[in-house]
């Protein structure tokens, strides 16, 4: 039995993975059994065995349908995600729909097997674990695994699950750019604050993070990215280009009908792409590619840049967004650090350099190993390493997307805003929407838009057994708690009974596609006006409804009945009932209509209530509004609803007739 070894850091990449360990005061990146410091994230199944890493990638042309890679592009996503559907076109292995989740179907030892992306990733992690154990001569269980900073909740949870499946104890999920920043900043004694932009373009994902580094404190200011952009996409552009060229040269023969031919072409394209980072031209020579035809061709760097120009240019959008969110202009960034193999592409470097007005880019860290390096440092810190190098290191990371829940009117009320430092915990009190409501449905969303329908539903749960009471009286305390992995726990407690329910948002929901994330965040700017208009409309509607109910309950109060004439009381009741009836039939009216109706209602109610006060001589004792917040409170000692107190009109986080809950200040 091997003794227990130190904790390791693993960079689980889309195309390559890497493992490092911090010992004797420094990080060592560990080479695998082939002597390579990075291992392909490939798993192959044959009639006799399972191969992982180099061995799997080396036989891919002979066995394309049973060699699985790019699992990171499936992890935590739904089958019908557009990105997944686009990717399936490029893969030789079969992806099937298993209850909305993508599963990979392969032939293994003469049987058909299905694997989830988590299982495939766990096999790659297992290879990294064994690589570390062979080097250390000890058993490895504790690890820190990296994920793209822009990975959402489902993807983080799924990655953690993959670690668990492979028999690892996942101490922490760390964001890749943050890990790379540690690799950049660990040995630098930064006395005064420096703003560092990490530009991390890998095989399948792209992240930009801005950190301030000072005295061993690494604080993430903002993060942005695209979980579906990387070297694989550049390879695909080359493959498509040569498939067309082959058709032209050989009487319309279509390579895509032969999976092995496409795989051989893809391998050649990846090699050519790498060559083009240092040469102006690359040659492709593949013998007997299809039906005995040899394919000899070449491609220039200029042509490659043209084929990928839109993809290369799109890397600047997250840079702009990260700067905006961090409230920094270009000049305030001290260092631009390149991470990820795809940052070796000269055009990508040139675009970034031009964006920063010709500033020199920082290439001081190894782009393939930096993330594993940082993860290894974090693993050492979490296991209490006393080494001087990591003694005073502090990491402050952020949540990439806003998190909240649905409140009345389909509005998303954010409890945690994007780029909030994690871990974090936010609690807010909500109340019921209708009288004697027995339970509330708590629906948790992630995204930047005002209305829940434009955001991503992460999960939902019911809090039942609320004692019967008028609307607005029960108080339900909802807590959002994001741990240091960026994974969300939500709990709800009914304050009167102490009844509690909680949910860890797990991966039952897939995740947003690149299109959706872009639509949510970038378009949020364009949609802002619409969002605000909708919020105001819902707030006006809630305001009117609340005012009507409040007035009704005020004049039904025994103490008020004594002080008000029956005819006046009936007038108020009838007008309130008429208003509520109108509201039921006009859920989608404009803000102005609701405001007009409220003025009408006030013109009936206010004189009567004011007269009652004068007669009562302003003496107290007339109830004010309904207890429990979210309802109008009265003037001192009186029953005139004062505006719409407690999360009502003008409060963007209140909403219209929602299914369940409404906000309380």
UniProtKB/Swiss-Prot annotation:
UniProt keyword ATP-binding, yes or no: yes
InterPro entries (UniProt xref): ATPase_NBD (IPR043129), Heat_shock_70_CS (IPR018181), HSP70_C_sf (IPR029048), HSP70_peptide-bd_sf (IPR029047), Hsp_70_fam (IPR013126)
Bias-annotated ranges (Gly residues): 629-658
Region (Disordered): 629-665
PROSITE patterns listed in its UniProt record: HSP70_1, HSP70_2, HSP70_3
Keyword vocabulary terms for this entry: ATP-binding, Nucleotide-binding, Stress response
Record carries keyword Chloroplast: no
Superkingdom to which the source organism belongs: Eukaryota
Single GO molecular function: ATP binding
Annotated Gene3D superfamilies: 1.20.1270.10, 3.30.30.30, 3.30.420.40, Actin, Chain A, domain 4, Substrate Binding Domain Of DNAk, Chain A, domain 1
SUPFAM superfamilies: Actin-like ATPase domain, Heat shock protein 70kD (HSP70), C-terminal subdomain, Heat shock protein 70kD (HSP70), peptide-binding domain
Family of this protein: Belongs to the heat shock protein 70 family.
Protein name, UniProt field: Heat shock cognate 70 kDa protein
Species the sequence originates in: Echinococcus granulosus (Hydatid tapeworm)
């Amino acid at each position: 039995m091997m003794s227990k070894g130190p904790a390791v850091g693993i960079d689980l990449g889309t195309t390559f993975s890497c493992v490092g360990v911090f010992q004797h005061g420094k990080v060592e990146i560990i080479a695998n059994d082939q002597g390579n410091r990075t291992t392909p994230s490939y798993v192959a199944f044959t009639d006799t065995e399972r191969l992982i890493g180099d061995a799997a990638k080396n036989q891919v042309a002979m066995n394309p349908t049973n060699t699985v890679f790019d699992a990171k592009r499936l992890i935590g996503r739904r089958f019908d995600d557009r990105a997944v559907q686009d990717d399936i076109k490029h893969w030789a292995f079969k992806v099937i729909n298993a209850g909305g989740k993508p599963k990979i179907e392969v032939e293994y030892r003469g049987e058909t097997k299905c694997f989830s992306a988590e299982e495939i990733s766990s096999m790659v992690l297992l290879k990294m674990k064994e690589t570390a154990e062979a080097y250390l001569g000890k058993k490895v269980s504790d690890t820190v695994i990296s994920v793209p900073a822009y990975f959402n909740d489902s993807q983080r949870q799924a990655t953690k699950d993959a670690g668990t499946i492979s028999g690892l104890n996942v101490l922490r999920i760390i964001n890749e750019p943050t890990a790379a920043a540690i690799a950049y900043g660990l040995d630098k004694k930064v006395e005064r604050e420096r703003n560092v932009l990490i530009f991390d373009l890998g095989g399948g994902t792209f992240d930009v993070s801005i950190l301030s580094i000072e005295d061993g404190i690494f604080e993430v200011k903002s993060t942005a990215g695209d979980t579906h952009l990387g070297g694989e996409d550049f390879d695909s552009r080359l493959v498509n280009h040569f498939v067309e060229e082959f058709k032209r040269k050989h009487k319309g023969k279509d390579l895509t009908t032969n999976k092995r031919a496409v795989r051989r072409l893809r391998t050649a394209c990846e090699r050519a792409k790498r060559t083009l980072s240092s040469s102006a031209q690359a040659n492709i020579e593949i013998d007997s590619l299809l039906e005995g035809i040899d394919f000899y061709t070449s491609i220039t760097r200029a042509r490659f840049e043209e084929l990928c120009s839109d993809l290369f240019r799109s890397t600047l959008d997250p840079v702009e967004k990260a700067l905006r969110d961090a409230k920094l202009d270009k000049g305030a960034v001290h260092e631009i650090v390149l991470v990820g193999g795809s940052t070796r592409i000269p055009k990508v470097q040139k675009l970034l350099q031009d964006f920063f007005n010709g500033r020199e880019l920082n290439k001081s860290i190894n782009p393939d190993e930096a993330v594993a390096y940082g993860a290894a440092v974090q693993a050492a810190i979490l296991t209490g390493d006393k080494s001087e190098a990591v003694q005073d290191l502090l990491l402050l990371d952020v949540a990439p997307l806003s998190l909240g829940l649905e409140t009345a009117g389909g509005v998303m009320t954010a409890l945690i805003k994007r780029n909030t430092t994690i871990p974090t915990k936010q609690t807010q009190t909500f109340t019921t929407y209708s009288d004697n409501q027995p339970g509330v449905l708590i629906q948790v969303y992630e995204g930047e838009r005002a209305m829940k329908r434009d955001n991503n539903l992460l999960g939902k749960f019911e809090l039942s057994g609320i004692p019967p009471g008028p609307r607005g009286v029960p108080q339900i305390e909802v807590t959002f708690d994001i741990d240091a992995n960026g994974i969300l726990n939500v709990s709800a407690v009914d304050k009167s009974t102490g009844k509690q329910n909680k949910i860890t948002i797990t991966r039952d929901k897939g995740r947003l596609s690149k299109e959706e994330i872009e639509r949510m965040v970038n378009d949020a700017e364009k949609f802002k006006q619409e969002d605000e208009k909708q919020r105001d409309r819902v707030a006006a509607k809630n305001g009117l409804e609340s005012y009507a109910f409040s007035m009704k309950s005020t004049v039904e109060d025994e103490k008020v009945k004594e002080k008000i004439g029956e005819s006046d009381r009936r007038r108020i009741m009838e007008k309130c009932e008429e208003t509520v009836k109108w509201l039921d039939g006009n859920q989608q009216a404009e803000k102005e209509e609701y405001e007009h109706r409220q003025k009408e209602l006030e013109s009936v109610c206010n004189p009567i209530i004011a007269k009652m006060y004068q007669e009562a001589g302003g003496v107290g004792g007339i109830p004010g509004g309904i207890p429990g917040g979210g309802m109008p409170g009265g003037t001192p000692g009186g029953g005139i609803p004062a505006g719409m107190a407690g999360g009502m009109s003008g409060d963007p986080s209140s909403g219209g007739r929602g299914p369940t809950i409404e906000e309380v200040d």
